[in-house]
Amino acid sequence: KYTNRETAILASKYFAIDFDRKSQAAFMLFRGQKGHEDVEILLAQEFIEGHFAAKITVDSLAKKYAVGRRSFERRFKKATNNTVVEYIQRVKIEAAKRSFESSRKNIHEVMFDVGYTDTKAFRTVFKKITGVTPVEYRNKYNKQVTG
């Protein structure tokens, strides 16, 4: 009544405590871990966030920022506390969560939109990061689909 749907969902994630769960991961908000001073890694993070639907490899990122692969992986892990692959997965899953919250797209459409082509891999990564399946997440946060 006093705000929009996006703000309501955000507030529900901050204040929701679901006691039936083993994990509260579905409510976590990914902020990108940018509180570091490594310029190349910041640029790589911004590139990943802007191009998450494309196929991004560690080698291509290291080459793009003129850093050796091992050095790039080590610096990325030190700066973000995630490996490059974990970070890419988290960005993709965060985009999928936003899509589930705000659109009527089905699981396959969202999966393709965020750059996954394998349903099982998408479900596995989604559940690992959020603690719930994509269907459960969509049903909980998108009342347009269920209501």
Q: What is each model feature region?
A:
Residues 72, 76, 121-122, 126:
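Short hydrophobic/aromatic patch on the recognition helix
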Residues 46, 55, 59, 78-118, ...:
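Terminal helix-turn-helix DNA-binding modules in bacterial transcription factors
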Residues 62-67, 115:
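Helix-turn-helix
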